[in-house]
Every structure is written in C-alpha cells, then in structure tokens.
C-alpha cells in the first residue's frame, strides 16, 4: 500500500497520528450564511471551470443559504449588483465548465489600503450584512488575492465572521503556494503553437531573418519558458531569455551572431521590461534600407538612443 495511507482503514497517516485535541484545533466550526463568488483580472480559457466548481459546491452545501455571483468582480459587490445563482438553470450553469472568458464579468479595481481609505471596505461590510454573507470567494490572480487578504483582515478587525477564500487563476503562473495555476497550461499551449507557426513563417524568405518574440509575464518567466515546448516538434526557438536571469546585451549579441552565421536565421523568445528596453535602444541604432537595415553612423546612433523615451512608438517608424 501507499506509505501515505494506513493499511487498516485508509486514513492518511498524518491525520491518524494527530490527537483528538489537535484535530479539533485545526477544524472550523459550522458557519451558516450566504456566499458571494466573483471573478477579476484577465480572463482565461478555464477560469469559468473554477468558478463553476465553487458555485456548484456552494449550492449543494447545507451551511450556505444563498449563492450570489458578483457582476464584474468586487465592483459588483460595491454596486450591489449581484445575481442569485440558485435561480439559474443548473444545465445552463454546467456550460461554464467549457466556456472561456469570465462568465460573471471582470474588473481591474484595486482596493486601497484600509488604513488610508476604508470607504470601500465599509461598503463591502454593509453589503455582506445585508445578505448575511459569511463566505466570499474571489477568482483571480495576484491582485485578486491581495483583495482577499485585505477584505479578510478588515472583517476580522471589525468582528464580522466571514471566510474569505481566493481561487487561483493566472496565466503568468506566479501565485505563491501553487504548483501550476489554472489558465497557465492553456496559455503555454498557445505560446508553443505560436512559436511553431513563427518558425515556419521565418523560413520562407531567401534572406536571413532574426525574429524576436516578446511574451508577457511581468517578472515571471513561466510563459516565456513554455516556448521551449515547440522544440518537441523541432520548431523551437534558438534562444530563450527569462526575467529571473540577469540580461547581458553583449553576450546576447554574440550568441545571436553565432547562430545567425551558422543557420542564417535566429528565433529568440524573451520577456521582462529591462530586456525589451535594451533591445528597443539597439533598434534605434539602425535605419531601414531597400535591402533591410543598416547601422547608423556613430553620432546619429548616439542621438537616437539619447532621445529614446521608453515608448515603443519612438522606433516603430
């Protein structure tokens, strides 16, 4: 049998060795009340599947009296714009499992520090009391988890018992405490497919080509790293640069030149504002000609880079 299971009754060993007092200490008392579920941040292919799981389970839980969906995330709570999910057709709700985007609507609204301005928090508490909300689920990424943290602390400070839970969702895959977030896998698949398509597009020309693919991800390189999946089909990038690794322009240029001299083309994938900024500056040092790009004279190159503001429009033309 598994070393994590008791051969006698299947109870996990960790659970079995806890005393009755310890088990009671970790268990929560029964709490009855309504539940609000909301979504925020960028939608993904699977965020609705997570929301559906929470909605369905809440509707079946005897401790939860009503289940409400917040329209457009926390703004729906602030505006008292809630949907009674118990009145929805269960068969229609089940379609959420396979429906992309955010079924309840989303927002990019960030709550302020309650020590600076607690207006929103007082309004949230007012709505919670109005509907006797004792459970709040928020489905999103880092900002959504920050919202959960702030609301939970405010409710605790004001003596209102409410269990606040974050449901992870981010294609960046950068939420602490998660191995892989819902949304990352589908985004990784999309990136790998896109890199394979770019690989084939870049090979059709009779002149050499250097292709730079910029991928989002804030300061996390999970999405960028997923481009390596294209290598399984022999269409992967030549170079991958992650924001977690310091970027050296000279080393980068040497590697690009070496691969270009060998293969006649280069595909590189990267992310991170510092990397992109360096490449944008370098791009200004060239002018477009009939046969491609040629370096500017040293004096003109210096002026172009000095005038660079960090705006992509500076070099787009």
Language-model features and meaning:
Residues 26-81:
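N-terminal phosphate-binding or glycine-rich loops at protein starts, especially the Walker A/P-loop
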Residues 30-38, 96-110, 169-179, 206-209:
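Gly-rich Lys/Arg/Thr-decorated short loops/hinges at beta-loop-alpha junctions or inter-strand turns
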Residues 34-42, 134-143:
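A short, small-residue-rich loop immediately preceding and capping a beta-strand
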Residues 40-42, 70-76, 108-109, 141-142, ...:
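Short, ordered loop/turn segments at secondary-structure junctions
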Residues 127, 135-140, 146-161, 165, ...:
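Accessory alpha-helical/coil subdomains and C-terminal extensions
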